[in-house]
């Protein structure tokens, strides 16, 4: 997993990488990179009724960017994002939640997922309890 680190949600929107309109796993962290919340955005860009809809993380939080930035201001917290295969996004999210047990994830911390992989973390990455660096 090739992680990219951001300090503001607005920076994700302004990034050069397609504004994250693709399937990804994201981690909201403390200053030191410890996961607080792990999620996925697995919807690809699509066309519905002649209108093109954004996909991925941009669609997931489209109306909440400024609120999320306001909540994060001055905290030193970060957002880490890794592009993933849409078919594996849910399984990877479940595995990361189970292994790291982030404070703000309500589900998935006690039951092991049905499938798991050896995840290799690259780039500027969050502080994960498992996986290869």
For the regions a language model picked out, list residue spans one by one.
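Boundary/linker segments flanking structured domains
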Residues: 1-36, 40-133
């Amino acid at each position: 997993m090739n992680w990219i680190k951001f300090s503001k949600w607005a920076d994700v929107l302004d990034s050069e990488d397609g504004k994250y309109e693709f399937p990804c796993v994201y981690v909201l962290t403390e200053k030191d990179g410890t996961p607080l919340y792990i999620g996925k955005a697995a919807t690809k860009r699509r066309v519905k009724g002649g209108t093109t809809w954004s996909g991925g993380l941009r669609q997931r939080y489209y109306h909440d960017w400024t609120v999320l930035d306001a909540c994060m201001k001055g905290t030193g917290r970060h957002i880490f994002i890794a592009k993933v295969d849409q078919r594996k996004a849910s399984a990877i999210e479940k595995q990361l939640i189970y292994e790291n047990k982030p404070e703000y994830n309500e589900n998935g911390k006690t039951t092991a997922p049905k499938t798991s992989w050896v995840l290799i973390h690259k780039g500027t990455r969050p502080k994960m309890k498992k996986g290869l660096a």
